[in-house]
């Protein structure tokens, strides 16, 4: 099977475009996708037929229909927003588009219409606090979480109505680490009620118990992403991912320029098992949809590195590097038909 791979380049006006052969892990570079503005965050619906892109320089969200044979993007519509947000995501029904606003300190909800277009006006604009960085939903689609780096060093907790698209404050409305860790992004365990946040300011990962009945998070571990001999003042973290079987967790270090690798115990606790050197300033990385390969982009190197994932011990075997655009910050996969 093959996948279209799009790399969002914040310093260029285009996506870098590749075709991934999952049998070999090889990437074939194709023509860039011109977007007419500097792209940032990207989201798709579940089958990859619709793509939503934040053009940060133009302050717009744009909806595209994806030709899954060729990978071509066909514009459906675009809507103006006060500022380009650092994160886009759809809820689990693909009926609503969520965005966070780092500078404004807010979350928005837009309706996704039947034709894939984005509703012109947001259904909701919720002020939280400055440095709102991402938003994701639990498996039930009943709860959403918005991490904020330090300050305010908190994760906002919301209830979500998947019929109306309304977000409402859970009780308590936010949880805060005891130390200024600065939660940025997070992942849920694939089968257990656990949530892991990567913390930008503290260069740490926090493990949380997730109460599926109330939506509440309770932290039970904070662990460093860095080797003991590296000065944390020279590092921030960026992205976090977990293998499909829930055995290994990875977090990116900007400064140490590595992917921290953790073993996940049966009780959800983490143990550091090593670091893999990667491209400079690894703002984003992700597994391909099969979980066989990991792709990591360097925001300051302008390159993407690929790795073969060892499913037995979690280690990463370097495979190849590819030139992309300026300041890459997102990777999106779409299955090829």
Kindly label every feature range from the protein language model.
Residues 1-26:
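An edge-strand/N-cap motif at the start of beta-rich repeat modules
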Residues 10, 56, 102-104, 112, ...:
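Short loop/turn segments immediately following the C-termini of beta-strands
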Residues 18-25, 64-71, 110-118, 158-167, ...:
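Short loop/turn segments immediately following beta-strands, especially the blade-tip
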Residues 28-34, 74-79, 120-126, 170-177, ...:
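A short beta-strand motif characteristic of beta-propeller blades
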Residues 36-47, 79-96, 127-141, 177-192, ...:
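Beta-rich, blade/repeat-based domains predominating
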Residues 145-205:
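Loop-centered beta-sheet repeat module
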């Amino acid at each position: 099977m093959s996948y279209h791979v799009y790399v969002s380049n914040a310093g260029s006006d285009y996506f870098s475009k590749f075709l991934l052969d999952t049998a070999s892990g090889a990437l074939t570079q194709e023509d860039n996708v011109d977007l007419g503005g500097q792209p940032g965050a990207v989201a798709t619906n579940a089958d990859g037929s619709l793509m939503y892109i934040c053009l940060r320089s133009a302050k717009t969200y744009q909806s595209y229909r994806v030709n899954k044979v060729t990978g071509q993007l066909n514009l459906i519509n675009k809507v103006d927003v006060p500022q380009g947000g650092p994160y886009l995501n759809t809820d689990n029904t693909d009926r609503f588009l969520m965005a966070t606003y780092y500078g404004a300190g807010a979350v928005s909800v837009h309706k996704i219409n039947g034709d894939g277009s984005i509703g012109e006006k947001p259904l909701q604009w919720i002020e939280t606090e400055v440095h709102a960085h991402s938003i994701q939903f639990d498996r039930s689609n009943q709860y959403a979480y918005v991490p904020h780096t330090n300050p305010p060093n908190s994760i906002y907790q919301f209830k979500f109505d998947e019929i109306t698209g309304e977000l409402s404050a859970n009780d308590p409305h936010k949880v805060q680490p005891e130390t200024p860790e600065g939660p940025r992004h997070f992942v849920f365990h694939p089968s257990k009620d656990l949530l892991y946040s990567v913390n930008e300011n503290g260069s740490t990962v926090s493990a949380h118990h997730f109460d599926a009945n109330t939506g509440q998070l309770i932290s039970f571990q904070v662990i460093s992403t860095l080797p003991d001999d590296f000065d944390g003042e020279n590092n921030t973290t960026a992205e976090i991912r977990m293998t499909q079987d829930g055995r290994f967790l990875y977090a990116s270090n900007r400064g140490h320029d590595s992917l921290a690798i953790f073993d996940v115990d049966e009780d959800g606790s983490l143990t550091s098992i090593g670091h893999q050197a990667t491209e400079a300033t690894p703002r984003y990385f992700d597994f391909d949809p099969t979980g066989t390969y990991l792709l990591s982009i360097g925001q300051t190197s302008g390159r993407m590195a690929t790795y073969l994932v060892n499913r037995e011990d979690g280690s990463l075997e370097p495979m190849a590097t590819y030139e992309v655009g300026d300041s890459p910050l997102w990777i999106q996969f779409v299955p090829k038909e």
